[in-house]
Amino acid sequence: VDEVGSRNLGVLLDTYHMNIEEQNIGDAIRLVGDRLMNFHTGENNRTAPGRGHLDWDEIFRALSDIHYTGRIISEPFVMQGGEVGRDIHVYRDLVENPSEKTIDAEAKYLLEFEKGMLKKYFVD
């Protein structure tokens, strides 16, 4: 990114993949620093943040440390079927009794979880 030198080129980080590849997600975020343009959140098990084992306090602390102001895009994959479920090979439902009501509850949980993290690390 630095060698290209374009303000239109940056880095996208994804916590699901970082969980597999990085020794320390917070350190990786800090290393990327102001080159971070987009940030995808998803748990180690592809569910909503807070439903797995990732250290979300460290992740949001690192985003705060680099003064991140870009997009945060959540990518929980919670049930089989559909184009996305087929494309990423979701082989089992990740929520009990998937239904519109359950999915709505998961979406509400995710929104409240991430809003809480943003308030904790970004709002004075």
Please describe what each predicted stretch is.
Residues 1-124:
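Histidine-acidic metal/acid-base catalytic patches
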